């Protein structure tokens, strides 16, 4: 194993893209854009884009460039949505779907070199897309699915975090699940799309600051925006972070290792 996954708190700008950019594009953006974090859609039955570039060598190289990594698993989706692969309404079955997705995500994390040598460590965000919180059965099933995910991830020694909208996190009371969701990647978009240097994970319209308040938040603050930095244009969703992401240590020695104490400004350490 050439890389060891390490979790650290990143404070700064990040982005996600449905299809991961090329190594050359990412290297250019690291030099010229305000972004220092990038999402990795590592897998899941509901992942939209193939992300065929993703493998351990690719991830090692972008970590060597200096990127902070946000592994994300796009598994089954709430049964009251139109997604092709829902988890069941039955809460016991939904819980098991969460467990199974955690097992699959763990295997993929290990394949990509994102875990420690003992198969533990790392953080991965479960992507749960928007659902109708007025549908009580759907809310109950979704809560059970997330509990299955976090329960199994705790057993595996991996931080099983969650991507969801601020409305869903609040109205479905995801903040009071047991075991607790350790960190959240919150979808709440600004009215104006695109990069915003003043974007924050706090003072949101639909989620009080009381929940996930201690370096436990990422936020997707815009979506579907073409941005150009250093002459390279990529369609992205801009994000801001004050929460757990990954860096890689034990990299081959061609470049300095990224410190796990992370800061969003020009790649400098705290």
Question: Where on the chain are the PLM-derived regions?
Answer:
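Functionally critical loop-and-helix segments that line ligand-binding/catalytic clefts
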Residues: 2-19, 179-268
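Substrate-binding cleft of extracellular glycoside hydrolase catalytic domains
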Residues: 5-143, 155-156
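Short, aromatic/basic amphipathic alpha-helical patches
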Residues: 29, 55-60, 173-177, 203-206
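Flexible, glycine-rich phosphate/dinucleotide-binding loops
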Residues: 47, 78, 169, 193, ...
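A generic structural signal for alpha->beta connector loops
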Residues: 66, 157-159, 181, 215
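Acidic carboxylate-rich catalytic motifs and surrounding loops in phosphoryl-/glycosyl-chemistry enzymes
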Residues: 74-76, 162-168, 223
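Active-site-adjacent substructure of cysteine-protease-like catalytic cores
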Residues: 142, 146-149, 168-176
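Aromatic-lined carbohydrate-recognition surfaces of secreted/lumenal glycan-active proteins
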Residues: 153-171, 184-188
């Amino acid at each position: 194993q050439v890389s060891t996954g390490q979790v650290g708190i990143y404070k700064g700008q990040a982005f996600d893209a449905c299809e991961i950019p090329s190594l050359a594009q990412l290297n250019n953006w690291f030099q010229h854009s305000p972004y220092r974090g990038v999402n990795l859609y590592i897998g899941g039955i509901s992942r939209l884009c193939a992300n065929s570039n993703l493998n351990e060598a690719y991830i090692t190289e972008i970590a060597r460039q200096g990127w902070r990594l946000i592994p994300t698993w796009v598994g089954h989706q709430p049964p009251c949505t139109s997604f092709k692969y829902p988890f069941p309404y039955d809460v016991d079955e939904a819980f098991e779907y969460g467990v199974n997705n955690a097992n699959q995500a763990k295997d993929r994390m290990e394949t990509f070199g994102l875990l420690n040598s003992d198969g533990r460590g790392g953080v991965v965000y479960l992507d749960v897309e928007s659902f109708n919180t007025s549908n009580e059965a759907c809310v109950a099933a979704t809560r059970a699915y997330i509990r299955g995910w976090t329960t199994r991830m705790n057993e595996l020694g991996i931080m099983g975090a969650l991507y969801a909208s601020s409305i869903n996190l609040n109205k479905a009371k995801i903040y009071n699940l047991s075991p607790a969701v350790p960190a959240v990647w919150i979808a709440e978009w600004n009215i104006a799309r695109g990069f915003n240097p003043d974007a924050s994970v706090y003072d949101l319209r639909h989620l009080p600051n009381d929940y996930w308040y201690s370096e436990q938040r990422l936020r997707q603050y815009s979506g579907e925006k073409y941005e150009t930095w250093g002459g390279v244009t990529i369609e992205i969703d801009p994000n801001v972070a004050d929460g757990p992401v990954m860096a890689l240590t034990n990299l081959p020695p061609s470049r300095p290792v990224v410190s796990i104490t992370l800061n969003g400004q020009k790649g400098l350490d705290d």
